[in-house]
């Protein structure tokens, strides 16, 4: 089946579709971070990620194999899916992998921040860049305005979350700046891997280094 054969729901404009998808992304990632923060231990979270991830990936495979199932799913989720996802694997697959990695390797505060960097900072950068982006970052399709918005939001989030966990001490403002910069650089980087994969992992590593050595 060709991509052009699939009739996904349409909105009034491509920009509106993009914003809806980003807001959905933001709400889901924020919910995941909240649930991990409030209700789950590392071990419980890893078990849940493995279980849900396996079910989701199997469902995605069946969706791509059976056109009728794919059409039914598109009627519900078509508005929040990227065009290339209509006939290929969902972008949730690399996110599930990244989520498992950051939860397994890092402490809860760092893992939560990695999720929020992707779930809040990335959509903010995208939406601001879409409507206000005029200056392109060198060597990328990303805008300076989106980068700056991501940096500001990610820095503030880092300060709030780390302060809540009593981390950072006197170096907290500097660590927050480094965390925000790391997240925004990861989002703006021209890496060929999916943002859902490299943004959480790279930003978690940078935040861990900052907390360890500052």
PLM segments and residue spans:
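Alpha-helical transmembrane segments
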Residues: 44-56
